[in-house]
Design a protein with these regions (language model features):
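Helix-turn/linker elements and helix-coil junctions of extended alpha-helical scaffolds
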Residues: 64-67, 71, 93, 97-100, ...
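Extended, charged coiled-coil "stalk/tether" helices of large eukaryotic trafficking and scaffold proteins
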Residues: 4-53, 58-66, 498-504, 517-520, ...
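Eukaryotic N-terminal, low-complexity and coiled-coil-prone scaffolding/targeting segments
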Residues: 1-363, 367, 651-674
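Acidic, Ser/Thr-rich intrinsically disordered and amphipathic helical segments
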Residues: 55, 59-62, 81-84, 88, ...
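Eukaryote-specific, cytoplasm-facing alpha-helical/coiled-coil scaffolding segments in long proteins
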Residues: 146-157, 161, 184-195, 257-266, ...
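Context-gated lysine
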Residues: 17, 35, 41-42, 55, ...
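Extended alpha-helical solenoid scaffold regions that build the rod-like backbones
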Residues: 276-530, 534, 624-628
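Short amphipathic alpha-helical molecular recognition features
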Residues: 48, 52, 77, 81, ...
Length: 674
C-alpha cells in the first residue's frame, strides 16, 4: 500500500511541494506532463466512446428546429455532433452497400422506422441548409457549409433511393394477383355475359351493387391494409423530400402494368383504329372483340376505376392533388384505349348486321359515362365526359345510317321473278326480323334518333321553329325513330305490291299480298315495343288491308266455283234441264281439280292463317256443294252416271280443301270415296 501511495504521489505531486520558478523553468516537468497526458487520454476516450445515433439524431432535430426558428440558415455554425451524425449515417449506408444490402421492407421493422425517420430528418436538413441562403451571394457560404451541404445531399439522395426501392417492392411484389384477377381486385362476380340468364330483379340488384359496392368495401385492390399504410408513409417522405417525380413514376409504371394484365385477362386487344377498319373481320369483332370490350368497359367502370382511385388516394393520402393527377393519368389512358375501339367499330364499313352490336356498345357507354366521369378530378370531368360522349355520338350516328340504309336495301331488291307459291318474300322476312330485333332496342334507338335530330336542328336560325319542334314529339306525333320505321314499312309495302304484279293470276297476287301482310302484322304484334312504334292506327289499317286481300282472293278463286253450284238456269217449266246440270257438275269438278292442283303448292307457313283460310273456304263451298248435290243427285241414274258427274262427296271436298297451301307438289285427286 505504501508503495502504491508513493507511486500515486509521484504521478500527481501536490503543487505546494514544488518550487514555482523551477516549474516555470521546466515546462515539461513530470507534473505538467502527467496532467497533459491525462487530458489527452480523456479526450481520446471520449472520442472513442460511440455516442448513441438516436441521441445524435435528437440533437440534429434540435439543431434543425433552432435553424428554422432563427430563419437565417446561411449563418449557421456546424456543430461537432452534426459531423459525427453524418459519419454514423454514412457508415450505416456503407454497411448496406457492402454487405447483403438493406433488409427488404417489412423484414426488420426497426430498420424501416430508421429509414423513414432519417429520410424525413435529412429532407428537413436539405430544406434548411440549401434553401435558406441567397443564391446570388455565394461568398456568404463558407467552405465548411458547402462541404456539409454536399454530404447531406449525398446521404439524402441515398436514403431516397432506398425508399424508392422499397416503394417499388411494395407496389409490385406485395400485390396479390389471383388466377381470375391479376389486378388483385374484388370483382363482385361481375360478368356481363351471364346477364342473359338473370331475372330483371337480379339485374337491377347487380346494377346497384356495381354503382356503390366498392364505396362500402374496405379492402384495397390486391393490397393488405398494412401494405397500404407502408406505401403511404414512403410516398409521404418521398414527396416531402422532393422526390415526387420518382415516386409517381414507380407508381404509374406498376399500376399501368397491372391494367395491362387486367386487359389481357378480359381479352381486350390493343388495336389501332386503322387496323380495326382495314384488317379485322367483322365476324371476329362481333363474336369476340365487342363482347370483350363491353365487359371490360363495365368492369372498369364498376370495379377497377373506383378501386384504383381508392388505392391512389390511400397511398398518397397526404397529397390529394398528386393522387388525383395519378388516377387521372392512369385511368385516362385506359379510357382512351376503350374509346378508340368504339370509334374504330363505328368507322367500319356499314352493314345491316352491325347495327345491334353498335347499339350494345352505345348502351354500355350510356350506362357508365356519369359513373366514370365523377371519379376524375373536377378539372378533368368535362374533358372525359366530352370524349366519352363523342365516341357515343359516333356509335349513334353509325347506327342511324345503318338503320336508314334499310330503305336502300328495299329499293335495291329488284328481282324480276316471283316467289313460288305466293310465299312470304325473303325481303319481307329480313326486314321484319330486323325490325323485331330493333324493337328490343326501341328506347336506345329513340334516344339515338332524338339526339341526331337535335344536332341537325341546332344549326337552325329560327328559334321559334326550334321551340315548336321541341314540343312536337308528343304521344300522337311519331318520334323521329317511328317516322323512319314508318318510311321503311311504306317502302316495303310498295316493293311487295310491285312483286305481286309479277304473278299472272290475280288470285295468287292477292294471296301473296295477304300472306306477306299477315307475316308483317304478326311480327309487329308480337313485339310490344314495335307495336308502340307503329301505333294502333297503322295496325288497324294493316288489318283492314289483309281483309281486303282475303276477300279479293276468295272472289277470284272460289266465287267461280260457287257459280257452278248456282241453281239458276237448271230448271225449265219445273223440270231439271239435265244437259245443263251435267255441264255444271263437269265444270265444278274441273275447276275444283284445277284449284286443288294449283293451290296445293301455294305456301302458307303461318298455321293460324292456313287454318283460317281453309275454314273460310269450307264455310263457303261445303254447304253450297252439299245443298246442290242433295237437290240434283236424284236427276242422274244410279250407278255409273252418278259417279261420272258427282265426283265428290261433301266430305271429300273438305278433305281436299285441308290439303291446300302446304307447298307440296300436286298429287292427282283420286276417285270418289265411298
Amino acid at each position: 500500500m505504501e508503495n502504491n501511495n508513493n507511486a500515486g504521489d509521484t504521478l500527481h505531486p501536490p503543487a505546494a511541494k514544488h518550487d514555482g520558478a523551477a516549474a516555470q523553468a521546466n515546462p515539461l516537468s513530470p507534473t505538467r506532463h502527467a496532467k497533459a497526458e491525462e487530458d489527452r487520454k480523456k479526450e481520446e476516450a471520449a472520442a472513442s466512446t460511440p455516442t448513441s445515433l438516436e441521441k445524435l439524431a435528437q440533437e440534429i432535430d434540435q439543431f434543425v428546429r433552432r435553424l428554422k426558428t432563427d430563419g437565417n440558415a446561411h449563418n449557421f455554425e456546424i456543430p461537432d455532433f452534426a459531423e459525427r451524425y453524418l459519419d454514423l449515417v454514412e457508415e450505416k449506408i456503407m454497411k448496406y452497400d457492402a454487405g447483403e444490402g438493406k433488409p427488404r421492407w417489412g423484414e426488420v421493422s426497426e430498420e424501416d422506422s430508421w429509414l423513414l425517420n432519417n429520410a424525413n430528418r435529412f429532407s428537413k436538413l436539405m430544406t434548411l441548409v440549401t434553401g435558406n441562403y441567397p443564391d446570388h451571394e455565394p461568398e456568404k457560404i463558407s467552405g465548411a457549409q458547402v462541404s456539409m451541404m454536399n454530404r447531406i445531399s449525398s446521404i439524402h439522395q441515398r436514403l431516397m433511393t432506398y425508399l424508392e426501392e422499397d416503394f417499388r417492392f411494395l407496389i409490385e411484389e406485395s400485390r396479390i394477383p389471383t388466377e381470375l384477377d391479376p389486378g388483385g381486385y374484388n370483382q363482385n362476380s361481375i360478368d356481363t355475359k351471364g346477364k342473359q340468364h338473370m331475372t330483371a330483379s337480379e339485374q337491377q340488384q347487380e346494377v346497384a351493387q356495381e354503382q356503390d359496392g366498392l364505396e362500402q368495401d374496405t379492402n384495397f385492390p390486391g393490397y393488405s391494409e398494412e401494405t397500404i399504410a407502408s406505401l403511404s408513409k414512403i410516398a409521404s417522405e418521398m414527396l416531402f423530400g422532393g422526390y415526387e417525380s420518382e415516386c409517381c413514376q414507380v407508381y404509374i409504371i406498376s399500376r399501368r402494368n397491372a391494367f395491362e394484365e387486367i386487359n389481357q385477362k378480359l381479352a381486350l386487344e390493343k388495336i389501332s383504329i386503322d387496323e380495326m377498319v382495314t384488317k379485322v373481320q367483322w365476324e371476329t369483332m362481333a363474336r369476340d372483340m365487342i363482347p370483350a370490350w363491353i365487359n371490360t368497359l363495365k368492369q372498369y367502370a364498376a370495379v377497377y376505376f373506383p378501386g384504383e382511385r381508392k388505392l391512389t388516394e390511400a397511398v398518397f393520402a397526404n397529397n390529394q392533388a398528386v393522387a388525383a393527377g395519378l388516377f387521372s393519368s392512369l385511368s385516362r389512358g385506359v379510357v382512351i384505349q376503350l374509346l378508340n375501339f368504339a370509334e374504330g367499330a363505328a368507322m367500319t364499313k356499314r352493314a345491316g348486321e352491325k347495327l345491334f352490336k353498335l347499339l350494345d356498345m352505345y348502351e354500355s357507354l350510356c350506362q357508365v359515362i356519369s359513373n366514370v366521369a365523377r371519379l376524375f378530378p373536377d378539372e378533368s370531368v368535362e374533358e372525359i365526359k366530352t370524349e366519352m360522349n363523342l365516341a357515343k355520338s359516333r356509335l349513334g350516328e353509325a347506327s342511324i345510317h345503318i338503320f336508314c340504309d334499310l330503305e336502300n336495301q328495299i329499293k335495291s331488291e329488284t328481282a324480276k321473278s316471283a316467289v313460288p307459291g305466293g310465299a312470304v318474300h325473303p325481303l319481307t322476312r329480313y326486314i321484319m326480323n330486323y325490325l323485331s330485333i330493333a324493337g328490343d332496342y326501341k328506347e336506345t334507338l329513340e334516344q339515338v334518333f332524338r339526339e341526331h335530330t337535335k344536332r341537325d336542328r341546332s344549326g337552325s336560325t329560327s328559334k321559334n321553329a326550334e321551340q315548336k319542334n321541341e314540343g312536337s314529339w308528343d304521344k300522337e306525333t311519331p318520334s323521329p325513330f317511328a317516322k323512319q320505321t314508318l318510311r321503311v314499312m311504306d317502302l316495303l309495302d310498295s316493293s311487295l305490291e310491285g312483286k305481286a304484279r309479277l304473278y299472272k293470276e290475280v288470285a295468287l297476287s292477292n294471296f301473296f299480298m295477304m300472306n306477306n301482310g299477315r307475316y308483317i302484322l304478326q311480327k309487329i304484334k308480337s313485339s310490344k315495343e314495335m307495336s308502340k312504334v307503329m301505333g294502333d292506327n297503322w295496325i288497324r289499317k294493316k288489318s283492314s288491308d289483309l281483309r281486303n286481300y282475303h276477300k279479293n282472293y276468295q272472289r277470284e278463286t272460289w266465287n267461280r266455283v260457287l257459280q257452278c253450284l248456282n241453281h239458276e238456269g237448271l230448271t225449265v217449266n219445273g223440270k231439271v234441264h239435265k244437259p245443263v246440270l251435267k255441264e255444271r257438275f263437269k265444270s265444278f269438278n274441273s275447276l275444283f281439280d284445277e284449284i286443288h292442283k294449283t293451290q296445293s303448292s301455294w305456301v302458307v307457313k303461318d298455321e293460324q292463317l292456313q287454318s283460317e283460310l281453309r275454314v273460310s273456304i269450307s264455310a263457303v263451298i261445303i254447304p253450297a256443294y252439299r245443298s246442290f248435290v242433295a237437290r240434283f243427285a236424284q236427276t242422274f241414274d244410279p250407278g255409273r252416271q252418278t259417279e261420272k258427274y258427282i265426283k265428290y262427296q261433301a266430305e271429300d271436298i273438305e278433305t281436299y280443301i285441308d290439303e291446300l297451301f302446304e307447298g307440296k307438289p300436286h298429287q292427282s285427286i283420286g276417285k270418289r270415296r265411298t
